[in-house]
UniProtKB/Swiss-Prot annotation:
Record: residues binding GTP: R17, R68, T99, K160, R262, L263, R264
Name the record gives this protein: GTP 3',8-cyclase
This enzyme's EC code(s): 4.1.99.22
HAMAP family: MoaA_B
Binding residues annotated for [4Fe-4S] cluster 2, in chain numbering: C257, C260, C274
Annotated GO biological process: Mo-molybdopterin cofactor biosynthetic process
InterPro entries: Aldolase_TIM, Elp3/MiaA/NifB-like_rSAM, MoaA, MoaA_NifB_PqqE_Fe-S-bd_CS, MoaA_twitch, MoCo_biosynth_MoaA/MoaC, rSAM
Function: Catalyzes the cyclization of GTP to (8S)-3',8-cyclo-7,8-dihydroguanosine 5'-triphosphate.
The encoding gene: moaA
Amino acid sequence: MASQLTDVFARKFYYLRLSITDVCNFRCTYCLPDGYKPSGVTNKGFLTVDEIRRVTRAFASLGTEKVRLTGGEPSLRRDFTDIIAAVRENDAIRQIAVTTNGYRLERDVANWRDAGLTGINVSVDSLDARQFHAITGQDKFNQVMAGIDAAFEAGFEKVKVNTVLMRDVNHHQLDTFLNWIQHRPIQLRFIELMETGEGSELFRKHHISGQVLRDELLRRGWIHQLRQRSDGPAQVFCHPDYAGEIGLIMPYEKDFCATCNRLRVSSIGKLHLCLFGEGGVNLRDLLEGDTQQQALEARISAALREKKQTHFLHQNNTGITQNLSYIGG
């Protein structure tokens, strides 16, 4: 099914990133270094299972093929398995993924798969337990590693691992990461550090271009693969001697936004056209019952007329995004 969600730059949107909470129990230096602080979410709190069912139904009707559940830490919601099942009700949605810190992976991943989850991204910024603790504020490295093993045991053929690339922290550890994925079907995705409203100082200190790793991978014989239409923004590389893959997400690269295929809905029901963008379009008043789906679809489609051509990060724009937990990075 071709996506009906098309913007004025002829980009088609097949991929929804749906935040279901902004609460997180980790204190990652690049996201929530001081820990989670409630952002004043009052009124109805975070989206309910029924509201999630309605908003994903609308996106599915408009051609969305992939939904990623984000946060915060999605698995902190007690009804997380029910949320997966609610999204799974949409036959048009072929992929349901989660981005998680891995805290509850070992315990719950089999149940998530049974509910309909098809993909997992786990955040691991270092393979050194002490450095992992320093970055995340949690001494959970072994627990997260056990969770990744549990995901394979539960039947996931591949696990994606997200690593925020930081100068003088982990950028020099490529060989360690490559050894880890040589015999494991892990897609290791290095993500360039992005500047947010609260993270300007960290950005200036630790940002390094992913181009450095890209050049090194090509020098070592890694091969760039083609993207599918519902894939995320990573440039993916493979090598015949490795079971795993490497992905590079480089938002500061020229033309990064030209292939944008994803929209975001926050945990309080606002449609965000860009991670670094405007205040969002409220959808929640149309999620109260099943009778408003046509109006909901119309509002989503109309909002796309306002999507900008680029995120303007090159002009030092950080938008309203104070930290990445707010609308699910």
